[in-house]
Amino acid sequence: VLMLDDIPVEEVLTPRSVIFFLNKESSVKEVLEKHNNIEFSRIPVCDNGLDNIVGVVRRHILLKSKAEDQFDIKIGELARPIHTVQEADSVGDVLDEFVKRREHMFMVKDEFGQVTGLITLEDAIETLLGVEIVDETDSVVDMRKLALDNWRKKRWKTQE
């Protein structure tokens, strides 16, 4: 039996190095011109980088704004607040928090208040089931593996 209370969030989070985020000052037009096919349904919104998270925007809100010709709206105006958990919190506690708050994504911080990643409801359920949930829109199956691969490539280049 898998004990979710024994697994810390830091073991299952999506690392900050592979988080796709948007700047709060960008307009809907700028975002959609630069990223014409956003694959994530929920996107963190920041003010000058990941250490200053201001909220989360849902992809469908961006597309709705586009459909309503609201191209000049700033992403920060569309963002909703996002809850933060600690990387030492258990996946079990965070799963309970997802259910209680009716949310699907939380930012994760370390003991110093630095953003270390994010965790989704899907991450918690995958941990419970012990398998990756992959749907037709996933271009990357495992974001933790992607972060590790990127780190290895960068390290290899610096050693050359």
Predicted features and spans:
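Cytosolic regulatory modules rich in charged/polar residues
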Residues: 1-160
